[in-house]
Amino acid sequence: MSHWASWMRFVVVAVGGLALDLWSKQWAFHTLRQGGPPRVVIPHVLEFQTMLNKGALFGIGAGQTGLFLVASALALVLVVWMFSQTPRHRRLLHVALGAILAGALGNMFDRATVKLYEHPLPAGNRLVYVAPVSREGAEVLLREYPPRDGAVTFRLYPDPGRGDVYVVQRLPGGIRRRLKALPREVGFVRDFIKIPTTVPAWSWIPQKLRGRELWPWVFNVADALLVAGVGVLAIHLWRDRRPERPGSAAVGDAKTG
């Protein structure tokens, strides 16, 4: 079992990382214009651009909210168990496990609280995501996300004459559509960090690769904590399982003999 100082390192990193992740997401989504152009922080190196991601790390496995929540809960249990089995002198490993816990909790919080409705448009059955804008009694005003010029707005309300059948009125235009149930809710993760690096246009690089983004994903602090923590953990596991060199045991015996 780890020493109390080890627990302190683990908890401080986990709580501090989680607080930084949630605060940075709150700041970005209240300061930056959603759906707008990126804010350049360091040209060609760092930009801020808000985006809702329905997948896991870097958008993998989009739309599986329930599966991600269950997997995240299991991962949290595994991380705490691994920490409890870690020797007290593995300080860097304590920090890495705390970072993994912070990242998992940060994205898990978003998936459980940041929800959009998944709704097919009447014309062409095109699937869009709509966010609740306001509520008045049983009626909900929904607007297409992300915000853009010409975004579709809906009014969702129950049909009093047909029980739990819902009516969606598209605004403007008054196009109506009946639904047997509410649109499906999907959990999202808030991302806002972008590294806008591209392949340079050097002569020896193939033409089709020049100008392509090296890092097309938008991510958040939780993603960075997860990647850093898992990287350190992988290095530790690899070092612990490396086979001993043939002469190392004999040398050790000679020194102790």
Which residues does each PLM region occupy?
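Alpha-helical transmembrane bundles and membrane-interface segments of multipass inner-membrane proteins
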Residues: 1-257
